[in-house]
Amino acid sequence: MSHVYTIGKYLGHEGSEMLIDAAVKGLSGAAKDKENGGWYSSITPDGGHVDNKLCYVHAFVILAASGAALAGHPKGEELLQDALDTYDRYFWNEEDGMACDTWNTEFTELDPYRGLNANMHTVEAFLAAADVTGDEKYRMRCGRIIKHVIGWASDNEWRIPEHYTSNWEPDLE
């Protein structure tokens, strides 16, 4: 939703800046894992958190932070840099040219599952990050993800598999 608030600001919707600020505060506060880094996948009603770190969530933090930076929020650029650094450290795999999916909370155990949903949202986030930072490596990464997806689709009668093994072999079951 944070990205939508940025769009709202540029469309002139009153109150959008207040919503951007609330999003930045949430991402810098309760949603942020100050002990292990990164962001919690979910906050429970009792104030706890779900015990994992999802690529999907971190991509959305990049998207939200990109919007906040674009909107001129005073902490937007700092949040974006933190999100990109965390993503690069834990989720982006340069060798594969794809993102991994799920870590435990401490970032010590990587789940073998690989999925396209997280990579789809990574493309969205990286395009926004490239627009805000001017760093073209994020567009290049998007191209690598897209090239993989086109290859898998062409090998599967133009149907795009969503689930993969740790070696990026389609899991069609």
Give the ranges of each region predicted by the language model.
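Glycan-recognition and catalytic cores of secretory/periplasmic carbohydrate-active enzymes
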Residues: 2-173
